[in-house]
Amino acid sequence: MEGSNRTVAAVILDLLAKEGVEKAFGIPGVHNLGFWNALSKERPEIVSVRHEQSCVYAADGLSRATGKLAVAITTTGPGAANTLGAFGEAAISGSHVLLISSEAPIKNRSTQGARGILHEMDDQSALFSPLAKRVTIDNEELVLAKSCRSADEAIATVVDFLKCLSVAPVGAGYIGVPADVLNQEFVGQIPQPSDRVMAFLGKLENEIIDLNPVMRLLTESKKIGIWAGGGATSVSSEIAELSNHFSAPIFTSFAGRGIGSASKNYLSIPIHEAEAENLLSECEILLIFGSQLDGMNTKNWSIKFPKKLVLFDANPRVALRNISADVVIESSKLAMIISELLKLEGRDQWADAAKISTETRKRVSLSDKGKAGMTLVSAIEKSWPIENNIVCDMAISGYWTGVYLHTNRPRQIAYPVGWGTLGFGLPASLGPSSTGLATLLVCGDGGIAFGLGELATVAQEQLPLTILLHDDGGYGMLRFDQQVMHHPERGVNLFNPNWKVLAQSFGIEFVDSDLNKLPEVLAKRSVSSAPAIVLITESLYPPKSTSPRWSEE
């Protein structure tokens, strides 16, 4: 394809294919049809969704499942603006996502500002700039959100952004291309990354890391703990090895679930349970890998941190707003760092993380507040294969699953407590299920209502998606918030459709289940290549990871 006549849209698709992108998600519009016109077997397939927000959610879900770049394509003005909630979730959660949108045709624009071209606005990229990934090059900040004006600028921007998005810390980017430019023939050579970007990448590659301060602190410490966040998903086996070497319990953030799970020291309970927090407080030093230590993961920073903290992160500035670290190592080379730490003398076992996890889970399972939630968790653990994906929405059922499920590998669960985006679940599940791997969506009736149109996408694509739908009559978590705060229940009790009739109208299988039948139902669904909705209606009490319960003893 390099030597043939290609439009700008075709060249962009070829660059994405070269980057390993096999599927993108989008909606065609009058301005972005150039992408659909350029489709071919050698270029990424574009899966058509039913709402622009969904195309970014789907890309986000795919990126979380694979760790690779995922792409969304939308159209000018309202089409691009519709993606903002999903773009924010991807950006805040550190997903490797690129949104490409058409913009108003350049030939019709006025130099004085918007003049009323269909879908036109003054600066479309400005919608995304506050959320987009930033990199600092020679003390200047490059924001990965740009509106291009020419074919050469568009292609050069794609080349540069693909490079910048590929390095940690991961984030989301936006590129806008005028509609008439997308359809222009590209006659130039594909450029190399700009000198600025190459210098930036070279600096990262050749960075010098001084681990001596870390080594000194570790030499003085016997009880070592490890905290793994979403920025450490690529070093799961290395963290497990380090944990075994230091006999260090592994605490994980929501995004870090499954990291180091091969270690006997992996905790399968959240820090929000007293047993986990007490163990954390017993550590003399905590090694923090790739975590921002945000409010939801730390009960708004009220947990009992050890006295000594060491932070390893490609961008430690956010975490340093939340903690004071004794040593900060700004680097993405976590595997190399861990290999150096392994040269230190090992430590004797001082805590039984497996026993603590087992006993805590048993205690929660036997409690009035936790019995139903842990029954749900157990059903999924028993019946949903490790290699299959799970996507959770902001729902009580999702909170139990995303936090308490014994996660056996990184990226097994996509959980939207980055930005906390209700309605994430259904459109995000389109991403991993589009690869052909059976995917479980755990959601509530309130969240799924945000994207019911995507049931048409599920049906049309015949995605291997099981929608485990918990119907509690509306916004169950918000209802609980109102009850705890002694507020009247207003705006939370909602009318729902007949789920069976709804499923049938889309040609989707429907199963009316309950928690006792769920293991058998999910086991059958885990090997099915067709979509289904599985309904449960039992009452679920929110888990201790939810903020209204943080103050409980």
Kindly label every feature range from the protein language model:
Residues M1-S4, V135-D152, G176, Q189-I190, ...:
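Phosphate/pyrophosphate-binding active-site segments
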Residues V11-V21, G61-G67, L162-P169, D210-I224, ...:
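Glycine-rich phosphate/diphosphate-binding loops that line cofactor/substrate pockets in enzymes
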Residues R64, A228-A314, V318, N408-A438, ...:
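Glycine-rich, anion-gripping cofactor-binding loops and their flanking helix/strand elements
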